[in-house]
Amino acid sequence: MKQRLLCLMAAIFMAFAWSIGLGTQQASAANILIHMKTSLALDDAQICAVPNVAWTAVKAGHTVTILVDASAVTSVTKGFGWFRGLIGSDSTALDRASLPERERESLSQQMGVPLDQIPHNYGEYFDFLKNKLGVEIYGNQTMMLLYKIDPARVASAVTPVPLDRMMQLFTEADRIIVY
C-alpha cells in the first residue's frame, strides 16, 4: 500500500511538473531589437558591445534587428564631422575602429569560427552581421536629418527608415536591448 501511494504521488508530481514546464527547455526563438543610441565618439564601450550581443543572439537561434538611433547615426556615416567632410573621407567611425586582436581571438574561440573569418574593424563587423548572419540593420532617418546627414553617405549595411517603421520595429520585438 505504501509503495502504491509513493508511486501515485510521484506520478502526480511528474504530471504537475510537466504541465507547468519544469524539466522542459523553453527554446523558442525571440525577435530581438538592439537599440544602438550612443555614438562611438561618446562611448566606444557601448557601441562596440552591440555586434557581439547580436552575433551571440543569432547563434542562439534568435532573429536580430539593430536600430541605429540618436548620436549613433554619426558612427555609421561616411566622412561625418567637419574635418572628415573637408577631406572627403569615405569611411565611417566604425570602419576606423579596429577590433583588438585579443577580441578577435576571443570571438573566434567563443563562436567557433576561424580567426581569418573574424572581421578586423567594426564596419566590417556590421557588414558581416548583415550579409553573413542575416541581421537587419536600420537607421533613424529623422535623426540623420537633424545631424544633416545625407542618407546616401550612410554605411551600406544600414537602411535609413522613417519614424513609423521604427515604431513598428519596437512593437514587433519580443525583447529590446538598449546600448
Please report, for each region that a protein language model flagged, where it lies by residue:
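Positively charged n-region of N-terminal signal peptides that target proteins for export
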Residues: 1-4
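Secreted/extracellular ectodomain signature
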Residues: 25-174
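Short hydrophobic/aromatic patches at helix-to-coil boundaries
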Residues: 176-179
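Bacterial N-terminal signal peptides
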Residues: 9-21
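A ubiquitous, low-specificity "background" feature that marks scattered single residues
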Residues: 8-9, 75
